Regions:
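Conserved positions in beta-strands of structured domains
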Residues: 10, 102-105
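Mixed-charge, low-complexity intrinsically disordered regions
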Residues: 1-97, 109-118, 122-223
Length: 223
């Protein structure tokens, strides 16, 4: 089977560190989906504007491995417990393919690079290859009774973020909210809990440095 890359997504997250662990956790985090030339046909998007959300099937292009392991160590479990790869959304899979549900903000047909999709809530690093786009169907895709296995106790955990507003002056308003949301999701590996350690992530061309102590993330610099 041959799989073609139909598009790439542009986001403000240029490194894996800081990317939300699931889609929808940071609704303010925007993304732009640019189709590859063979697929820049407005007819391919006809009717898409009627859907509020989309499924993106994508490639974990920064997580390719020559061999796969039947078990992985989910970061949310502290990195010291193993789970079956098919019981996780780890990027280290037999086939490096992921699934992300995003909100469709706008479809623009008159962009220079052809039809462009503006989305929000993506959990994808800048430049991620998109393999397919499908509409989210509430009547079929929503299961309120679903359970989340070992992830249920972890889903609501967030950090308090302390940040001087002046540090965010170089970002657009929505980017400020997105960055604060990314930080609140605690980008650190669970096994790292040194209050003296200074962490850094790249966001919208800025180097963001911060510390975490007793559930509070303090932003030191955005430069």
């Amino acid at each position: 089977m041959t799989v073609d890359v139909i598009a790439h997504i542009r986001t403000d997250l240029t490194d894996k560190f800081g990317v939300p662990r699931q889609s929808g956790l940071v609704p303010e985090l925007g993304g732009t989906i640019v189709l590859e030339p063979p697929y820049r046909n407005p007819d391919a998007l006809r009717g898409l504007e009627g859907f509020s959300h989309l499924w993106l099937i994508f490639q974990f292009h920064r997580a390719a491995r020559a061999e796969w392991s039947p078990t992985v160590r989910p970061p949310r479990l502290g990195g010291n417990r193993r789970m079956g790869v098919f019981a996780t959304r780890s990027p280290f899979r037999p086939n490096a393919i992921g699934l992300s549900c995003v909100k469709l903000e706008e479809v623009r047909l008159d962009e220079k690079l052809g039809p462009v999709l503006y989305v929000s809530g993506a959990d994808l690093v800048d430049g991620t290859p998109i393999l397919d786009i499908k509409p989210y169907l509430p009547y079929a895709d929503c299961h309120p009774e679903a359970t989340g296995g070992f992830t249920d106790p972890l889903s609501a955990q967030k950090l308090e973020v302390s940040c001087d507003p002046a540090l965010l002056a170089g970002l657009a308003p929505r980017q400020r909210e997105a960055l604060l949301g990314v930080l609140a999701c605690d980008p650190r590996p669970r096994y790292q809990d040194d209050p003296e350690r200074v962490y850094g992530l790249s966001f919208a061309g800025k180097n963001v440095r911060f510390t975490v102590e007793k559930g509070v993330l303090t932003v030191l610099a955005v430069e």
